[in-house]
């Protein structure tokens, strides 16, 4: 495997689900902030920025977890923990990607740039929260959802209350899907003394996931309704609700394969909401 392929794996470009889980909330925000008519330049900036920052986050995560990943079945072959990439290289990759991302938003307003600094700090510190915070997935939800206030700031030069409520919804969504993800690694994480929501929720993990989905979908529906979205948005939300119910059938047995499949399927939940938002603005 050549160096380029190793870097490709380091930043998880071979696993785009993480990019999509960041991108959908950002797109919801851009469409709502612009009344369904987003600027194509802004769309390009935020889409590329999402890819770059998620990639930087993966590099930082592998650096921070290099002494733990070797003991987890799913992560044992990651480039840093396996010694194929040096920790210093991972840090340099993360720094380069973060700088590129910041360069992208340099032409935007001051508020957006200020929020981007907060986003970088949150993304960079997330891996360490897993060591002492009982539900680190909540912090992940802030990191994965910071494109929401940034999107509103870029379009409106302000961040309305609705944007913060969407961010709260994204926190609950992240707790839901990343708990499914954590259920895959629960036994390994227990041995390592790591803290995850799957461990914290214990035997109530499935109920907690479904509760988080309910809060997520409820908050998003309320925000969309306040923005005048109706029929097609409601249809998208109905499909998203169906996705959440389907996830219950996948995780209720707590089997690794089912939990991982549920995690990956969240792409379609986010896409359904986005599709409903776009169609509602188009068909009026």
Swiss-Prot record:
Q: Does the keyword GTP-binding apply?
A: no
Q: How does it sit in the membrane?
A: Multi-pass membrane protein
Which InterPro entries does the protein's record reference?
HB_polyprenyltransferase-like (IPR006370), Prenyltransferase (IPR039653), UbiA_prenyltransferase (IPR000537), UbiA_prenylTrfase_CS (IPR030470), UbiA_sf (IPR044878)
EC number, UniProt record: 2.5.1.39
Q: What class of enzyme is it?
A: transferase
This enzyme catalyses:
all-trans-octaprenyl diphosphate + 4-hydroxybenzoate = 4-hydroxy-3-(all-trans-octaprenyl)benzoate + diphosphate
- What CDD domains does its record include? PT_UbiA_COQ2
Q: Which Gene3D superfamilies match?
A: UbiA prenyltransferase
Which GO BP terms, alphabetically?
ubiquinone biosynthetic process
What this chain does, per the record?
Catalyzes the prenylation of para-hydroxybenzoate (PHB) with an all-trans polyprenyl group. Mediates the second step in the final reaction sequence of ubiquinone-8 (UQ-8) biosynthesis, which is the condensation of the polyisoprenoid side chain with PHB, generating the first membrane-bound Q intermediate 3-octaprenyl-4-hydroxybenzoate.
The name this protein carries in UniProt is: 4-hydroxybenzoate octaprenyltransferase
UniProt keywords (A-Z) are: Cell inner membrane, Cell membrane, Magnesium, Membrane, Transferase, Transmembrane, Transmembrane helix, Ubiquinone biosynthesis
Q: Where in the cell is it found?
A: Cell inner membrane
Which molecular function term from Gene Ontology is one that the record holds? Answer: 4-hydroxybenzoate polyprenyltransferase activity
**Needed cofactors:** Mg(2+)
The keyword Cell membrane appears for this protein: yes
């Amino acid at each position: 495997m050549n160096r380029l392929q190793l870097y490709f794996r380091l930043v998880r470009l071979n696993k785009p689900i993480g990019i999509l889980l960041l991108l959908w909330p950002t797109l919801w925000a851009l469409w709502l902030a612009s009344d369904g008519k987003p600027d194509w330049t802004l769309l390009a900036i935020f889409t590329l920025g999402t890819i770059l920052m998620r990639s930087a986050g993966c590099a930082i995560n592998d650096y921070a977890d290099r002494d733990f990943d070797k003991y987890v079945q799913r992560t044992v072959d990651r480039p840093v923990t396996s010694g194929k990439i040096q920790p210093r290289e991972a840090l340099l990759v993360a720094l380069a990607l973060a700088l590129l991302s910041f360069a992208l938003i340099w032409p935007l307003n001051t508020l957006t740039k200020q929020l981007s600094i907060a986003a970088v700090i949150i993304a960079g510190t997330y891996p360490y929260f897993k060591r002492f915070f009982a539900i680190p997935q909540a912090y992940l939800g802030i990191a994965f959802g910071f494109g929401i206030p940034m999107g509103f700031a870029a379009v409106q030069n302000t961040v309305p209350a609705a944007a913060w409520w969407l961010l709260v919804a994204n926190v609950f969504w992240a707790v839901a899907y990343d708990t499914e993800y954590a259920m895959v690694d629960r036994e390994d994480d227990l041995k390592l003394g790591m803290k995850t929501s799957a461990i914290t929720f214990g035997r109530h993990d499935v109920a907690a996931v479904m509760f988080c989905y309910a809060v997520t979908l409820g908050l998003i529906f309320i925000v969309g309704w306040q923005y005048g979205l109706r029929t097609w948005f409601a249809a998208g939300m109905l499909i998203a609700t169906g996705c959440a119910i389907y996830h219950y059938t996948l995780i209720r047995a707590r089997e690794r394969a089912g939990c991982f499949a549920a995690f990956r399927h969240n792409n379609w939940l986010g896409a359904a909401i986005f599709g409903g938002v776009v169609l509602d603005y188009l068909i009026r």
